[in-house]
Design a protein with these regions (language model features):
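N-terminal ligand-binding/catalytic initiation module
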Residues: 1-49
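Short, surface-exposed connector motifs at secondary-structure boundaries
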Residues: 3-5, 72-76, 158-161, 179-187
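Short catalytic-loop micro-motif centered on adjacent basic/acidic residues
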Residues: 9, 80-81, 162-165, 187-190
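Short glycine/threonine-rich loop-to-helix capping motif typified by GTGT followed
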Residues: 18-22, 86-95, 177-178, 202
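Conserved helix-loop functional segments at active or binding sites
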Residues: 29, 64-69, 149, 169, ...
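Glycine-rich phosphate/diphosphate-binding loop of Rossmann-like nucleotide-binding domains
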Residues: 39-42, 47-53, 57-154
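A glycine- and small/hydrophobic-rich beta-loop-beta segment
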Residues: 143, 147-151, 156-160, 174-180
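Rossmann-fold NAD(P)-binding glycine/threonine-rich loop
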Residues: 167-203
Length: 203
């Protein structure tokens, strides 16, 4: 059911380079071949440089082009990002590099709001927390007291210029889209797969 010319599985929520590596190892063992059958492998197993960064960075570059149509850029903008996995981490990194201030990250339990911004050092902590220790985003607020954790909520009520849903499908609904618009959001850049509901798109 899988193969370079059939179906090429990729990582997703809870499935990163480690898990893809496990599956690729078994594929090699069963098929006795080393082909491009799974994407998201580590570099030691034939993975591509910048593969982990590609989606998050690409979301920012796409947003940059959208902003340019209005004569705007990331510089000085406030960004709300959902998620705290691969896509969200690198979207946060690139948005910060482009001059924005990222103020939210989330997971399935809730979101953190850091009015001072999630800079490179704080993001390094998030990457260690999520990628190595498999922790929860609420631990960010325990480490950085200026941040607030909102249990069971999504970050779309936070005032921002740019919203980047980078968590999961249907995470931004029509009411939340209207809230973003009312709060002055000028750009929504989707990093996740189908994160906006049809009602949100129409808003």
């Amino acid at each position: 059911h899988i193969g370079a010319n059939t179906d090429v599985p990729a990582g997703d929520i809870g499935v990163g380079g480690r898990e893809i590596g496990f599956m690729f190892g078994q594929y090699k063992r069963l098929r006795n071949e080393f082909t491009g059958t799974l994407t998201g492998k580590g570099l030691d197993w034939g993975g591509s440089p910048l593969r982990p960064e590609a989606t998050g960075y690409g979301t920012c570059y796409f947003a940059q082009e959208m902003l340019a149509t209005r004569g705007e850029s990331f510089k000085g903008k406030t960004v709300a990002i959902s998620g705290s996995g691969n896509v969200a981490q690198y979207a946060c990194e690139k948005a910060t590099q482009l001059g924005a201030k990222v103020v939210t990250l989330s997971d399935s339990s809730g979101y953190v709001y850091d009015p001072e911004g999630i800079d490179a050092d704080k993001l390094a902590y998030v990457m260690e927390l999520k990628n190595i220790f498999r922790g929860r985003i609420r631990e960010y607020a325990e480490k950085y007291p200026q941040a607030t954790y909102y249990e069971g909520q999504r970050p779309w009520s936070v005032k921002c210029d740019i919203a980047m849903p980078c968590a999961t499908q249907n995470e931004l609904d029509g009411d939340e889209a209207q809230t973003l618009i009312a709060n002055g959001c000028i750009c929504v850049a989707e990093g996740a797969n189908m994160p906006s509901t049809p009602e949100a798109i129409k808003a």
